[in-house]
């Protein structure tokens, strides 16, 4: 029997990484919010790799933190190993990654949600989204309970129509043994929402005592730990090692001999899998010339003996999995605790969303995370905080937040989804960002804290601390540009010792710092007036000065980008009536309805000639309206 069980400003459906950020953002902005989880023990769960960050993903986590989100703090609180990746490649692509304690991460996030004012947490399965006159009005649970709301955020992860596949064994299921959300897909279809079917997979979890670490390479964390959250200057933790090993020719033989039983190749799996996280059977087929593949053995936490076998996700039958894992170096006697599996799930075509993550056709309905066709905890959380902020702004009748491609990786991620769409699980990568020298992980606070403060997610105390840091950076850069180092025996001895050319006339410290062989830390020896600064400030100063020329060039490119972004296209435009546009452009522009000429230019199938036609039409339309 149906009954009204509660009235809220905002309902969030799902309490994974997207749902947690969305719910917290809404509640912290003063909106009465309720978040539903199929199982309260799944809040903040990591059903795959127990890690946060990585290439491109670390940038997202720091941006979430700069806006006032929780993921960075949760990762810092539960990290068991921290490393910065890509150190050899330069600061634009430095990426922070933390191995986290999976159980403690979930507990941390659940506790944060439970203690958050304005936020209720409820176990239950949402089966229906209620809509009247093109506006969302609430949700219905399988029990018949109705929760009225002014806005709803969908953050269902991989639960929608979830189907678990292990070889020939197939059953309905969600991640980590949870039951799936069986009914919501039909509700979304009835609302005219176009659905897609994707697939992802996860490797086996194995018992620590069954592994021979003496045959593997130990991988330690960084000696000096960089935290994810800008609220933490340092992080002191006892780190746990990870291990690197390899598959063998025997591994590949076992896989090849059992491809006739691999669901990926028998047609049992219909969903499209992630290109950048292929299963081991996919890797063996696609890269047949490779004699071995890397395998990382990673602990699941401090209080468990479970180890995660990264690089070997699979949907092969369990009997094949046992042979396959035991053929890996150091895993000869491995004891599998949880078998690898693939999961198929329903998601939406993200082209149905505005850049605010609100559905174009249903006001007040927002969507975030894997339901939007992405893969990864960080991508989900990034969408979650934006969907949460915008659901709150929608309810308050205020302007919604859209970050563009020059402001944040979050902007790149969302723009890619709503402009280009995706036909496979989308993951962020540094190569997707045109302005990556500006969008570094170290300066995420400088880029986004002002926005977080203006919205209301950054406290006054944190904002003042941020302004103090910003001033320290500006003052030190100015000091280095004004301080002239005169030539002397001591100075030239120092320069020669560091493989640098001696000087014969006075040189500014900033110019010396631009020399690739000289670091900010090394220059302390000939810089007696140097102030004592926090590590994060020193890092920022060094990057800003060393890459000043490149940064200026990229800022000029951003100016050109902004010009096209600022040429807005009215919502009422009928593209079919614009002569000169190609048929494909008319179809794509009508479907996506870009907000600006800049966005239109990024749509696949819209040519530079089509953009010229659009620009001329806009000018004529302007003149005609005057």
Curated annotation (Swiss-Prot):
Similarity comment: Belongs to the MnmG family.
Major localisation: cytoplasm
Gene3D superfamilies in the cross-refs: FAD/NAD(P)-binding domain, GidA associated domain, C-terminal subdomain, tRNA uridine 5-carboxymethylaminomethyl modification enzyme MnmG/GidA
Subunit structure as annotated in this protein's UniProt entry: Homodimer. Heterotetramer of two MnmE and two MnmG subunits.
Binding residue positions for FAD: 14-19
Keyword field: Cytoplasm, FAD, Flavoprotein, NAD, tRNA processing
Cofactors, names only: FAD
Record-level GO BP terms: tRNA methylation; tRNA wobble uridine modification
Molecular-function GO terms, alphabetical: flavin adenine dinucleotide binding
Signal peptide: none
Binding site for NAD(+): 273-287
Subcellular localization: Cytoplasm
One GO location term (cellular component): cytosol
Transmembrane residue ranges: none
General function of this protein: NAD-binding protein involved in the addition of a carboxymethylaminomethyl (cmnm) group at the wobble position (U34) of certain tRNAs, forming tRNA-cmnm(5)s(2)U34.
Organism (species): Caldicellulosiruptor saccharolyticus (strain ATCC 43494 / DSM 8903 / Tp8T 6331)
Protein name, entry field: tRNA uridine 5-carboxymethylaminomethyl modification enzyme MnmG
Any Pfam family: GIDA
């Amino acid at each position: 029997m149906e009954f009204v069980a509660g009235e809220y400003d905002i309902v969030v459906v799902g309490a994974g990484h997207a749902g947690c950020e969305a719910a917290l953002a809404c509640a912290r902005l003063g909106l009465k919010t309720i978040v539903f989880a199929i199982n309260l023990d799944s809040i903040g769960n990591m059903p795959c790799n127990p890690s946060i960050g990585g290439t491109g993903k670390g940038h997202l986590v720091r941006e979430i933190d700069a806006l006032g989100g929780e993921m960075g703090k949760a990762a810092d609180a539960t990290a068991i190993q921290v490393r910065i990746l890509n150190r050899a490649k330069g600061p634009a692509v430095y990426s922070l990654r933390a191995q986290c304690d999976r159980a403690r991460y979930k507990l941390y996030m659940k506790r944060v949600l439970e203690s958050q004012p304005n936020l209720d947490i409820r176990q239950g399965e949402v089966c229906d989204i209620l809509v009247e006159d093109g506006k969302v009005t609430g949700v219905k649970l399988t029990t018949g309970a109705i929760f009225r709301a002014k806005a709803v955020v969908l953050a269902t992860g991989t639960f929608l129509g979830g189907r678990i596949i292990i070889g020939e064994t197939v059953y309905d299921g969600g991640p980590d043994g949870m039951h799936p959300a069986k009914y919501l897909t039909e509700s979304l279809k009835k609302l005219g929402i176009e659905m897609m079917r994707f697939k992802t997979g996860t490797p086996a979890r194995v018992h620590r005592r069954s592994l021979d670490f003496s045959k593997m390479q130990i991988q330690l964390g960084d000696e000096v730990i960089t935290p994810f959250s800008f609220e933490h200057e340092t992080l002191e933790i006892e780190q746990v090692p990870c291990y690197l090993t390899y598959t063998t020719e025997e591994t590949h033989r076992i896989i090849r001999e059992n491809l006739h039983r691999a669901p990926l190749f028998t047609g049992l799996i219909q969903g499209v899998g992630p290109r950048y996280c292929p299963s081991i059977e996919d890797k063996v087929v696609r890269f047949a010339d490779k004699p071995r593949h890397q395998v990382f053995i990673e602990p699941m936490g401090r209080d468990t003996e479970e180890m995660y076998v990264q690089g070997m996700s699979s949907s092969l039958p369990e009997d094949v999995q046992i042979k396959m894992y035991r053929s890996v170096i150091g895993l000869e006697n491995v004891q599998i605790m949880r078998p690898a599996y693939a999961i198929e799930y329903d998601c939406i075509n993200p082209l149905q969303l505005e850049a605010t993550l609100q559905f174009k056709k249903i006001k007040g309905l927002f969507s975030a995370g894997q339901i939007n066709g992405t893969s990864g905890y960080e991508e989900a959380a990034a969408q979650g905080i934006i969907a949460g902020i915008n659901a709150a702004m929608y309810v308050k009748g205020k302007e919604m937040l859209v970050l563009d491609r020059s402001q944040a990786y979050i902007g790149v991620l969302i723009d890619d989804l709503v402009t280009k769409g995706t036909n496979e699980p989308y993951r962020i990568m540094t190569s997707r960002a045109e302005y990556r020298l500006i969008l570094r992980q170290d300066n995420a606070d400088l880029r986004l804290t002002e926005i977080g403060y203006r919205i209301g997610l950054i406290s006054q105390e944190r904002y003042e601390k941020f302004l103090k840091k910003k001033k320290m950076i500006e003052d030190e850069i100015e000091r280095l540009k004004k301080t002239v180092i005169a030539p002397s025996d001591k100075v030239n001895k120092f320069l020669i010792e560091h493989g640098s050319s001696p000087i014969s006339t006075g040189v500014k410290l900033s110019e010396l710092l631009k020399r690739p062989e000289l670091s900010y830390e090394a220059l302390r020896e000939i810089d007696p007036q140097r102030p004592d600064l926090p590590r994060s400030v020193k890092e920022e100063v060094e990057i800003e000065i060393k890459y000043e020329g490149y940064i200026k060039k990229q800022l000029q490119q951003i100016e050109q980008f902004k010009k096209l972004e600022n040429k807005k296209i009215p919502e009422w435009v009928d593209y079919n009536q614009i002569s000169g546009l190609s048929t494909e452009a008319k179809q794509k522009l009508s479907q996506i309805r870009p907000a600006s000429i800049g966005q239109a230019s990024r749509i696949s199938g819209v040519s530079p000639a089509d953009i010229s036609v659009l620009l001329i039409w806009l000018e004529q339309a302007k003149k005609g309206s005057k």
